[in-house]
Structures are given as C-alpha cells and as structure tokens.
C-alpha cells in the first residue's frame, strides 16, 4: 500500500524500514541504527549539550515540544524551556524540541535542516574527544540505540569515530 515511510518504523521498526526502502527504491541496506526522542535527549545530555541559535519564532514552538517531552518523562519543564532566541548552549530537551519544529519556516524541509544541524553540532562537539572518551561515550550511548550491527563491526566503528566525526552531514 501507499503509506508514509515513518509508518514502517511504527509498525515494524528498523527491519521493516530497511525492507520498505530496499523494496521501493531498490537500494541495498546492510545495517541501520535508530534512536527515539527519549534516547536522543539523553545522548545530547551525555555529551554536555550543544550550541544552537534558534529564532524567537522557533523557541515559541520548541517550548511546546519541551512541555510535551517533560510531561511524558515526569520532569519539570521550566528548567528546560528556552527563554530567548539567539546563540545559546542547549540541553537534550531543547535540542530535540528544536529538531522537531515543523510549523516555522518552510515546513518539513526546514525541519530536516534543523535535524541535520543538531546532528552536525553533536558531531562537532564530539570531535574534540579522545578515543578513550569516545569509547566511554559509546558504552553509555549504545544501550539507547536500536541497531542490527554486529559487535565486531561496532568495535571497528568505535575505533574509526575520529574519522567518522569529520564527515559532513548532508
């Protein structure tokens, strides 16, 4: 049938997303990794937050997402609310809320741009970490990641993190 790709994720997780992409686009996919909003909040907090520069319009919408995520996690929202637009250090709640905004700017296109920005800022932040720090971070983060990557490949990828973190997200 004709459904959105995110429906495959909701109904069958990573394996169904992979099969859907392979069947519809004839693209082979060897491995996948996925995180949900809760995990992304924790991962961003684990790296110490990131720098973002949201507009006043964006923070109005982002704060609604902050409220929702805090309510679902039984956390006081006031500590995670944006108070103003502009360049600032943000925590996991604020960064995920920023990445979720779809009703400011050019709808979904700008939302995916914000998502790439958050991922790029995370990678930029981790670039200054040593291999030992990156390995410890991977140990903390990996339990939050759903994937089909075998242990041997994961260990190889962790060793290659300094190179991987230099890649540009497009």
Residue map of PLM features:
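Non-catalytic, solvent-exposed segments at the cell envelope interface
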Residues: 1-170
């Amino acid at each position: 049938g004709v459904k959105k790709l995110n429906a495959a994720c909701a109904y069958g997780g990573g394996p169904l997303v992979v099969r859907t992409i392979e069947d519809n686009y004839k693209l082979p996919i060897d491995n996948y990794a996925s995180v949900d909003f809760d995990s992304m909040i924790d991962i961003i907090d684990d790296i110490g937050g990131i720098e973002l520069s949201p507009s006043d319009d964006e923070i109005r919408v982002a704060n609604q997402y902050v409220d929702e995520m805090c309510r679902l996690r039984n956390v006081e929202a006031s500590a995670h609310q944006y108070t103003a637009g502009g360049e600032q250090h943000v925590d996991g709640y604020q960064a995920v809320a920023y990445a979720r905004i779809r009703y400011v700017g050019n709808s979904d296109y700008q939302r995916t741009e914000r998502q790439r920005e958050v991922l790029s800022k995370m990678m930029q932040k981790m670039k200054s970490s040593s291999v030992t720090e990156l390995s410890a971070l991977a140990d903390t983060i990996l339990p939050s990641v759903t994937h089909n990557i075998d242990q041997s490949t994961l260990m190889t990828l962790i060793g290659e993190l300094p190179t991987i973190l230099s890649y540009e997200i497009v």
